[in-house]
Amino acid sequence: MIVLRRILVATDFSPAARFALARTGQLARQHDASLHVVHARPDLNLFCRASSAGGEHYQGIFEHAEQALKEELAYLERTFAIQVRGETRMGRASEALVAAITEIQPHLAVIGARGEHNAPAPPFLGGTALKLIAQTDCPVLLVRKPGLAAYTSALAAVDHSRDMARRLVDWATALLSEGDCHVVHAFDTPYVQRLRARGVSEAQIQACAEEARKTARNCVDDVLSGTFTAGRRLHAHLVCGEPIGAVLAEIARYQPDLAVIGQHRGAPLENATRFVGTVSLRIAYHAQCDVLVVP
């Protein structure tokens, strides 16, 4: 069972951050969770190296950030009637946010998928969001869509790891207030072309594919049988194909409010780059909906 009592949301006062704030406020109200809003501003030395502006401009940025943060806290309290705390931290955004997560220990971290810089084309994934996912063990919700209403449809992309699959489905159903949760298991028969080149018969290849489907079905059935579903409808989908394309096709087909994907952990030395180039990254980058990345 997912316990969601503390939520942290990052803000840079951009439109994308406003989407993230609204979603976080809705989730905090739904789960009766406390909410911590964090804004990162550059220290003076970093600001002066990156800009020709002087200290007086830096002071203006600081004052604007403090006022903007107060306004965002007031918006959250007024709109969602929740308990909210806010703070400004100095330093690079990703580093400040990771430090805040380490100290506050939220059950969920939320960030706008784009950040303050305009993306060249949708859907895109901002650098701070990417670094945050790579450098923390906290589930991270990437918000792309505006809206104050609760999620009513979700898609959990699972694989052969039953423990991870259960975790993803638990998160998907926890963030839904009610509605449909699509559980997608993409499977494939490895090395089909090599098998054909070696003269393996189509009947044998088909038998391998059926065995892969059976394994996927057993995994999904096992996960769904142990899922608490009050007010949610679970739908299992077995899709034969390469995981990235298969999952993105299912997202396009069912148009969920939220996609939930797993991030398998590597060795500690890989932390800074372990998310780069992975299946999870590519799905998170291309999915045109909110995406929750679960470690």
Spans of features found by a protein language model:
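Small/aliphatic-rich secondary-structure junction motif
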Residues: 1-55, 153-204, 286
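Short, structured interface segments
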Residues: 127-146
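General small-molecule cofactor/ligand-binding pocket signal
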Residues: 36-38, 85-89, 141, 182-184, ...
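Short, flexible loop segments at boundaries between secondary-structure elements
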Residues: 140, 280-295
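Glycine-rich, Arg-bearing micro-motifs that act as flexible, cationic patches
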Residues: 111-131, 151, 258-285
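Structural beta-alpha unit
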Residues: 1-3, 23, 56-60, 74-109, ...
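Short, well-ordered secondary-structure micro-motifs
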Residues: 48, 121-122, 167, 193-197, ...
